[in-house]
Amino acid sequence: MAANCERTFIAIKPDGVQRGLVGEIIKRFEQKGFRLVGMKFVHASEELLKQHYIDLKDRPFYPGLVKYMNSGPIVAMVWEGLNVVKTGRVMLGETNPADSKPGTIRGDFCIQVGRNIIHGSDSVESAQKEINLWFKPAELIDFKSCAHDWIYE
């Protein structure tokens, strides 16, 4: 995969969906120049969420996190572009919204860490694992955007 074809998994959590922030979040990723290659609106099962957050299973907040993520619909997405994992994390802001800068998604729209509206893969390896967990290969659309040559050299 070429450098500008790196992929990341981004999920708008139930609070982000309920607060009507889906369009604003998608807009920010599109305006940055990233390409949406997969998206689904789902009510994730407890089993899927436990698998997604398996690395956190021994943390005291884990049961509450799974319950919160299972409390409503999620918009699961795969975005593609140059350094999309790292840049996507910068766009999201810190996990704790109180530490997030204005202009980031969490800095602009969140107050508490337990309701931080969005998840983003923290590494290329995590992104691949999360994408494979949430999407079948046929659900990811491979295409070249007309804007590609206006974004990349």
Curated annotation (Swiss-Prot):
Q: Mainly resides where?
A: cytoplasm
Q: Which SUPFAM superfamilies match?
A: Nucleoside diphosphate kinase, NDK (SSF54919)
Where, subcellularly, is it found? Cytoplasm; Cell membrane
User: What residues form the catalytic site here?
Assistant: 119
Keyword Nucleus included in the entry's annotation: no
Task: Specify the signal sequence span.
Answer: none
Q: Could you tell me the keywords of this UniProt record? A: ATP-binding, Cell membrane, Cytoplasm, Kinase, Magnesium, Membrane, Metal-binding, Nucleotide metabolism, Nucleotide-binding, Phosphoprotein, Transferase
Q: Tissue expression, per UniProt?
A: Highest levels in the liver and kidney with lower levels in the heart, brain and breast muscle.
Q: Which Pfam families has this protein been placed in?
A: NDK (PF00334)
Among the entry's GO cellular component annotations, what is one?
A: cytoplasm
GO aspect biological process, one term: UTP biosynthetic process
Swiss-Prot/TrEMBL cofactor(s):
Mg(2+)
What is this enzyme's EC? 2.7.4.6
Which residues are recorded as binding ATP?
13, 61, 89, 95, 106, 116
Q: Known catalysed reaction(s)?
A: a 2'-deoxyribonucleoside 5'-diphosphate + ATP = a 2'-deoxyribonucleoside 5'-triphosphate + ADP; a ribonucleoside 5'-diphosphate + ATP = a ribonucleoside 5'-triphosphate + ADP
Which is one GO molecular function term here?
Answer: ATP binding
PANTHER family in the cross-refs: NUCLEOSIDE DIPHOSPHATE KINASE (PTHR11349)
To which protein family does this belong? Belongs to the NDK family.
| Protein name per Swiss-Prot or TrEMBL | Nucleoside diphosphate kinase
